[in-house]
Design a protein with these regions (language model features):
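Non-catalytic interaction/Regulatory regions outside core domains
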Residues: 1-132
Length: 132
């Protein structure tokens, strides 16, 4: 795991603390986490080696924007989260205020229900931390 420090963001340290708390002991299966601005910039991240934080952030923001548009078009209210499942795990994207997204990557055998609960809680902490 590597931590990416974004010195330009004044709350990066506090955000990283929330991300590390979400990752915890690894029991639930969270492998990586990132806080991303709605325009696709990394606020702070704790990602696996070999994952390009900037690319991950841009793709996550794009996916969330498309999902949000689909929710609006189908008149389903406001987007809360997006789950993408693959054969080697999942990626969960959760709104963390008007201008931020929490992205979580999991193991294949992750406890998705627990991760949903923990991610929503972390997104709430990020919302407060980032003032949004």
């Amino acid at each position: 795991m590597k931590s990416q420090m974004v010195s330009e963001h004044p709350r990066a340290s506090a955000v990283r603390s929330v991300l590390r708390k979400l990752m915890g002991s690894g029991e639930a299966g969270v492998k990586a986490a990132a806080a991303i601005s709605s325009d696709g910039l990394v606020i702070a991240s704790v990602l696996q080696e070999g994952v390009d934080a900037d690319r991950f952030a841009a793709m996550s923001a794009s996916l969330l924007a498309l999902a949000d548009r689909a929710i609006v078009e189908t008149k389903r209210g406001s987007l809360k989260q997006l789950l993408i499942e693959g054969t080697n795990g999942a990626v969960l994207l959760v709104q963390a205020g008007d201008d931020a997204v929490l992205a979580v990557s999991t193991d294949p055998g992750a406890l998705i229900g627990k991760i949903f609960i923990d991610a929503r809680s972390a997104a709430g902490e990020l919302r407060v931390c980032l003032g949004g």
